[in-house]
Design a protein with these regions (language model features):
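Conserved catalytic core of sirtuin-type NAD+-dependent deacylases
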Residues: 1-235
Length: 235
């Protein structure tokens, strides 16, 4: 822990990349653990452009359940710690694979949501923004198109603006902190390789050998320990 505190204090450009493990402490299921979404449902049957086109009833049911699961979910201490670090100038950029919007709800600025956001909806046919209640009510767009959340489905490209913005920060980073992701999904899995800076991996399961420092633990709990050490050193 002392090592990351030193690096975080000395770094002039720090980037944080988060995954599903960042959200589990807020009560959301992750995807790849034994109790995660993908153990219950084959992603190839629901989170794809094919499902949107040919099995819309299942697609809508799956995403409606995920949207409704967010109703009482709030950011945890770890989200607020990252916001505080950002405001103090300790970190310069936050990117996330999560679609839940919890970083933004915690007050973080200019978060790049690399896999989109489940908190907004659009028409697949005309691209027009739509109201969430219309999607939940299984309504179609006035043009006749199918409504869908603004998430990146399997088979779709990442939002180019968010990707390019994060990539530029990665290349400039002196320190990259990866939190709560197994780094199994391409191309986000490649981002930590794009930096010449120090790299830190925080996750319940280690599984990553190419990082300069690996810390096994829950995201929020680990961030609270690091934050306490930072505060101790600044007293």
């Amino acid at each position: 822990m002392e090592q990351i505190v030193e690096w975080l204090t000395l770094s002039k450009h720090t980037v944080v990349l988060t995954g599903a493990g960042m959200s589990t402490e807020s009560g959301l299921a992750d995807f790849r653990s034994k109790s995660g979404w993908w153990q219950q449902i084959d992603p190839r049957t629901v989170a794809t452009t094919e499902a949107l086109t040919s099995n819309y009833a299942l697609f809508q049911q799956f995403y409606a359940a995920r949207i409704q699961a967010l109703e009482d979910v709030k950011p945890h201490d770890g989200h607020f710690i990252l916001t505080n670090w950002q405001r103090r100038g300790l970190i310069q950029h936050i990117a996330t694979q999560n679609v839940d919007g919890l970083h933004t709800l915690a007050g973080s600025d200019n978060v790049d949501e690399l896999h989109g956001s489940i908190r907004s909806v659009r028409c697949q046919k005309c691209g027009q923004a739509a109201e969430m209640q219309h999607f939940l009510a299984k309504e179609a767009c006035p043009c006749g198109g199918k409504l869908r959340p603004n998430v990146v489905l399997f088979g779709e490209n990442l939002p180019q603006g968010a990707w390019n913005h994060t990539l530029s920060h990665m290349k400039a980073a002196q320190l990259v902190i990866v939190i709560g992701t197994s780094l199994e999904v391409y191309p986000v899995s490649q981002l930590p390789h794009m930096t010449n800076g120090k790299t830190v991996y925080i996750n319940l399961e280690s599984g990553q050998s190419h990082f300069d420092l690996t810390i096994e633990g829950k995201a929020g709990e680990t961030l609270k320990i690091i934050d306490a050490l930072l505060k101790r050193d600044t007293i």
